[in-house]
């Protein structure tokens, strides 16, 4: 399912533990790490897709998490040119995502990475709330910054100061109030 602009509808999941750290998964057979995410089926709402992807990629069920909130609209990112895909009638140039913030309320032993036929992750760990922005694959850094910026106030309400102070360059991305010359090199590409 690709929209008329070439973006595939998708959901992203920021899974937070009680101390404000977030789930960070290593992709199977790749050196890359990322948040759980995945495409929506044509008959799914974003919330339904989120719970399906959560289970497929982490083994967690709705009763293991609390849904804290979501980004208010779609956040987009473009794929690098070598990853752009075409089928008979449409070209997929990127993804548009609704990002969800969840808190793990069950025991972390419920995380099982082998729940689907083709697991997404082979290892996971907890990292600080802002860590993923500079450690995800380059072309996703802008969307990660925007998603975490939009979800940070919800996270702060739940865990207090444990999520840490938003780095200045993330504030600048989110508020768009400074020129790119003040930001890390990777930001100017997005």
UniProtKB/Swiss-Prot annotation:
Enzyme Commission designation: 3.6.1.-
Motif Nudix box, residue numbers: 38-59
Molecular function GO labels: pyrophosphatase activity
Catalytic class of the enzyme: hydrolase
CDD domains given in the database record: NUDIX_Ap4A_hydrolase_plant_like
Cofactor(s) required for function per UniProt: a divalent metal cation
Signal peptide from the UniProt entry: none
InterPro entries on file: NUDIX_hydrolase-like_dom_sf, NUDIX_hydrolase_CS, NUDIX_hydrolase_dom, RppH
Key words, A-Z: Hydrolase
One Pfam assignment: NUDIX
Stretches assigned to the Nudix hydrolase domain: 6-149
The family this protein is said to belong to: Belongs to the Nudix hydrolase family. RppH subfamily.
Function of the molecule: Accelerates the degradation of transcripts by removing pyrophosphate from the 5'-end of triphosphorylated RNA, leading to a more labile monophosphorylated state that can stimulate subsequent ribonuclease cleavage.
HAMAP family: Nudix_RppH
The name this protein goes by in its record: RNA pyrophosphohydrolase
Species of the source: Xylella fastidiosa (strain 9a5c)
């Amino acid at each position: 399912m690709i929209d008329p602009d070439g973006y595939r509808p998708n959901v992203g999941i920021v899974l937070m533990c009680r101390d404000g750290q977030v789930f960070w998964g290593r992709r199977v057979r790749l050196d890359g790490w990322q948040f759980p995410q995945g495409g929506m089926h044509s008959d799914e709402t974003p919330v339904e897709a989120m719970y399906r992807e959560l289970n497929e990629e982490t083994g967690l069920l709705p009763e293991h998490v609390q849904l804290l909130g979501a980004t208010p609209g779609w956040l987009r990112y473009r794929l690098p040119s070598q990853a752009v895909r075409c089928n008979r009638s449409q070209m997929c140039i990127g993804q548009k995502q609704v990002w969800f913030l969840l808190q793990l309320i069950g025991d972390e032993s419920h995380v099982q990475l082998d729940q689907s036929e083709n697991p997404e992750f082979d290892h996971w760990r907890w990292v600080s709330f802002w860590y993923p922005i500079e450690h995800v694959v380059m072309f996703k850094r802008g969307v990660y910054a925007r998603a975490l910026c939009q979800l940070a106030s919800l996270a702060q309400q739940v865990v207090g100061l444990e999520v840490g102070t938003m780095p200045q360059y993330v504030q600048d991305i989110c508020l768009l109030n400074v020129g790119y010359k003040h930001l890390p090199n990777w930001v100017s590409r997005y």
